[in-house]
Structure formats: C-alpha cells, structure tokens
Amino acid sequence: MPTLEERYLAAKQHLFRKVYGARLNPPQCDAVFQTEGPLLVLAGAGSGKTTVLVRRTAFLIRYGNAYHAPAPSGVREEEVGILETAAEMPPEQIEREILPLFIDHPCPPWAILAITFTNTAAKEIRERLLAELGDEEVASQIVAGTFHSVCVRFLRRYADRIGFDPSFTIYDTDDKKRVLTAILKDLNISDKILPPKTVANAISAAKDKLQGPESITDASSPRARDIRRVFEAYQKKLQACNALDFDDIIMKTVELLESCPEALAYYQNKFRYVLVDEYQDTNPAQFRLTELLSGGSRNIMVVGDDDQSIYAFRGATVKNILSFDKAYPDCRVIKLEQNYRSTKCILAAANAVISHNSDRHDKKLWCDAGEGEKIHLRETEDQNAEARAVIDTITAQMVLKHRHYRDFAVLYRVNEMARAFETAFAKSGIPHRILGGQRFYDRKEIRDMVAYLYIIMNPADNLRLLRVINEPRRGIGDKSLDAVAEIATAEALSMYEVMAHANRYTALARVAPKLVEFTDMMNEIRTAVEGGELTPSSLIERLFIRTGYRDMLTAGGEAEKPRIDAVEEFITGASEYESRAETPTLAGFMEEVALVSDVDKYDAEADSVVLMTIHSAKGLEFPVVFLPGMEEGIFPGAQSIGSEAEMAEERRLAYVAITRAKEELYILHTRERMLYGRTNANPLSRFVKTEIPESLLDIADPPRSFAPPRAGGYMHGGYGQGYRTPTPRPDGTPAPRRQESELYRRVEPPKPQKNAATFGVVRFAPGTRVRHATFGTGTVRSARDMGGDILYEVAFDSGMTKKLMATYAKLQKI
C-alpha cells in the first residue's frame, strides 16, 4: 500500500499532467517536467520541439522543480485527500488555484540560457515565451540567441583576457577570403595551386575542432606546410586588426572559459539551466562550449534529431547527438515521434527512406492526420519542361484548390538548378522569391557602409579601411597605401594610426593632407557617436553624406538609384533595430548585421512561391513541396556515391526535404538534364526507386499514344522507349495529336546513353601515373563511370587529392 508521501506525489503529478496534458502529448509533458540533470529530447520533424522548449522554459520560471519535488515532511491525510479530490476540477481551475501551491525553487528568467542556430528561432522562442508568460519584463530577461550572438556577448565582456579589445570586429566569409588572398600573394603561393577557399575550409575545419595552425602537422606534404604558413599569417593578421572570424567566435569563447576561472565561474553560476536547440547541427567546439557552460549545475537540455543532421560540410558532426548519452551517462532520453505537420503518406515515405541509415537513434514518425494524397512522381523531358510542369501545377492548384502562392516551395539539391526555374517563373509572371541568392548584406554599397561603421567602432580594422579608403575616390594610390602598410608594420601600429599622423613620415609627404583629412572626418564622427549624439541609423546617414558616397552614386544617374535605395533601406533596418533593442548600440547593431542568415530574412506571409536549396529549407514547412532533380548523380550527388558516411548524409537530406511537405509532395526527374554545361541521362534516384514503396506513389502515365510498354514497369527500369503512331485519317494524313498538359508533355524516346569512349575520353586504371596542367603529377586512385564521363580521384604529388571529370581534366599518362 502506498505511503502518504507517495500518494501526495502521485496526486500532485496527476494534477500537473491534467493541466499540461490538455495542450501537450505525454512525451512532450515528460520533457517539460524533467527539469533537473541532463536531458536529450529526440524531436522528429514536425513534432513540436519549439513548443516543448517554450513550455519547459515557462515551467522552470513558474514552478521550478515542482513536479518532482518530494512531499513536504509531515504531510497529512487531509492534504492528500484534497489533492485527490482536486483532480475533478477543470484544468483551468487547477492551474489557477492548485498548481501555485507546489512551486519549488523557481528559476529567475535571467538564469536560463537558450541557444539556437538562427536568429529567427531565437526570436520565435522569445515571442512565444511572452505569449506563454504574459509578462514582457520577465520574458525579455531570458538569454536566448544563436551560438555566435551569445558568444559575442561573452567575449565583449572578457575580450582583454584573450588579448583583444572589446571593440573587436567580425570578419565574414568574404572578408576572410580577401585576407587569405592577400596572404597567399605575400607568401608567393599560387592561388591556383592553393585556392583561398581551400585554405579557408582547412582553417574552419581546424577551428571547429578547437585546433590552431599547429594541428596541421604533415611535414612531408608541401601543401600542408603551405596551409600552415597561411593559417599562421592569417591569425596574426586577425590579431593585428582586432578582428575575429565566425569560427573564432566559438573557439575563443571556449578558450576564454578554459583559461579564465573567473569567467567560467561567472557564467556557470549565472545560468542554472542551459537549453540547446538543433543539437544535431553542433560541431566539436559547440559541444565543448555547452559542456563548459552547464558544468556547474549539469542541467543541460539538448533538443534535436539525428535524422536531420545535414551540415557536415560546415563542420557539424552527428556524433554529438548520437553519443550524448555516453557523454552524460545519467541523462534521460525522451522521443517525440508524433508529427503535427504532414499526412500519413508523406511520413511513411520519409520513414521508409531514413530507415536505410544504420547509425541512428531508433524512432518512427506517426500522426493522427489522414492518409492524404499519394506522392506525385513525374518525369519530364528536360530541366525546362520540369520547370514548366511545376508552373502548370501551381497554376492549376491556385484555381482548383484556392491556394496562395506562399503555399508552394521548390526545393532543389544544388543552387545551379535554380536557373531553369528562375527563367520559367519570370516568364510566367508568378510571384516568386529565391532564398539564397545575393543577400542584401552582400551588395557592394551595403558592404561599403558596413566597412565605414566598423572603422568607427574599430579603427585598427585594416581590411575594412583598405576597402573604403577610395570609395569614393580620394586620390590615394596603391603605392601610398603600401607605404602606409610598411610603416604600420615597422612601428607596430594600425594603418589608421599611421594615416592620422601622416605628416610625421617623409614617405607620405605628398599624400599626407588627403590621409589626415580622411581620419579627421572619421574621428569627428566617432566623437559624435561616443558622445551619444548619433544612433546607428543617424550614423549611417551621416557617413553616407559626409564620406561623399551619396554624391558618388547620385552622379551615376538613374542606373545607381537602386544602390541609393539599398542604403536607405539599410538605414531603415538600423531604425528598426533601435526600436526593438532594449539599449541600442553600434556594437549591438553590427553584431546583428554580421550574424544574420538567409533564413532570418524569410517572410512566411509574403505571397510568393519560394525557391531554395533543401539546406536552406530546414525548419520551414509548406502545404505543397516540389522536389526536382531526384536523380542519381544529383540527389544523391555524384561525389557522395561510394562513401557510406556521405550517402547517410544525403539520405538525411532527402528525409528533411520530404518532411517539409504538409499536404502534397511532387517528386520530379527528367530523361535528360543539362547541368554544369553537360547533358546527361540520369536514372531515377535510389531514394525514390528502391526506398519509397511504390504503393505510396502516384505515377502519372504519359499520354496514351506515348505510353511505355507494360513489360519492365516504371519503377523497374521500363522507362518507355516506344510509342504508337496515331491512326491515320481516311485521306492518309496523320491524325492530329491532342493537346497535352505541360506536366505530361510528349517527349522523344530517350537517346542511347553515351559512354566515355564516345567523348574520346581515355580510361586510366587505378595506379596510373598522370599529369594535370595545373596540379602537376599524381596517381589515379579510382575511376568511376558518370553518365558518359569518368570521375577520377587523383592523389597529386603536392599532397592534395582531387576529384576530376575526365572531359575537363585532360589528364596525360606519364
């Protein structure tokens, strides 16, 4: 027979479940109530993970550890009886009158850290917490932000402990490339042999693992030695410019916490609870960061789905979520498998595909929604017919199903597929947006304005200084700038400091007035900022005018008006930041600008069709989704085939793509596709042909006169290479063919696939010694047929390994 204490605890927990169970399913309730210790929530696609994050955070603030707290000492039978009777009350009354009696160590809002991967996710959490708590002051005190934005706050506070000034600036991908290009030139290393992007990737990969230049230790490889030299020079350049790149932001924060006991103690004591969203996308540095931050209380909750880990190319490792229970042996694991987004048919297809991955947490999505429509599988002649088929379907659904344009999304595997769709949509007049095209902040005029702002904030930023010193033209030549750089290096000063005192240096005598005029102008504006006279928006406006940038654009006439409009929109963005920030500062605005992403700019209410890569679509959902290019060599990609790890990632990407669809999913492929300047006849993707059950597919028959022969079947290689000639008229002329929808438009029988010999490509066996015009001599590791070409993997003597298409590589046997 249960004791009074056990009855009390059971009655209390029953009351909590009655209240929260009205809005959450049982596993979601489990996650909300599990407040203490490590917690891994495996949240399948569309399973309500954000709801759980928000409700759990609100629960911590309202009730603390109320659900699991033991019965008070000396509890009486009457008290237990009251609780057991209270179960008959309506949930609203229980929440209002009974639950507050159980509050146990509620958590102050500022002691909760919620880390996300996008600003949009952080904003949604804050907004939903406000709605849940009903108290703006409380909701605003929760620290919610991206990994980078949270770490920037930490670094500003303790920058001096790691050798930086708090006014440090942040270098983005383009800035990083510019610095590396200059370093390669200084070191006399050809950017053809060692491209800046290759070095950038190597540096990022090292920093993601919390490693520096010393980690590149292959002394026998000239390429590795060069990368290390560039890496070392790059870090020195960043230090001299008081700048950090994106990877440094995480790495330097870990360095701070590991080397500064004061900082570690401060943040471990400050944050009683650490919550991490999208944990499957974390890299080793982020794993270590969250481990350090939660090391005091060990109250860490991570939410994610290993089946949606799709960012290995950015350094993410699925191992973090797969081995979380090994890193935290006492953790509790809760699975959210009920989907609130898609139909049964769509989920069945997603489950079928992902089940072919072996190294994963076992889970299976299910839903209470209906079966829904089968997945529509369509074949078209080529990429242009594919795009027109999508447009025809959208046009028909707008009429027949009264949809909005925003209900549709076209998700493609690679950006290069966007061209055919962009052309077709432009001709059709259908409103559309391409997410992932040129970002607003990548426009030249915006990058120039951002550079001016960074110079105001951090005069030591030589990279930004060189970008705008002649924007607009000021008559300061390259030789003069080289002289400034030499003096700065010799005297351990920033280039800005040398320019400000140019009159002291005879080498700068001729150009000194222009240099001093520039720095005097910038110093005057900086003084106004420091004196509180200029907000970020008014600062941009003053820089736009005082620097002469506006006059330069105005002189360009009507052609430059869009650039003026862009800067004015930038000013508007700064004004919006000022209205929502509690304490608007230039540093705060610059952090927001530096850390914005494409998805953060996505507007779900804009009534237009969205075109984007599958990677960009993660976290989004649409009533109708089109997946073009579901073909071998594209999805999965050619270079992933043959690698178990890369194929597993491609399959996870397919799972993500399928689960973006709420109501209808269209999968498209072509008989021939031109991509990267070549035309290939790619087979239907294995993800569809062999992994999705045929019973889930609606396979459209081509028009009757072009029907494929029954033998073989569509899903088993019978693609229909014959057609029946229309019955002739009595006068002997052919009968007219009936007009067909573009979705099922007539296609010619597929042409025999060309083999490598047709193109005059010579096959080299593995082990063959070859020469390449740029990369030098090397040894063929493997050769794979690729739709009429050969994909070679060659290990070059320089130490690099390249995958090259034979047609373009023009390898010579030696």
PLM region spans:
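C-terminal accessory regions
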Residues: 554, 629-803, 808-814
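Post-Walker A helix-loop "phosphate-sensing" segment adjacent to the P-loop in P-loop NTPases
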Residues: 60-69, 107, 134
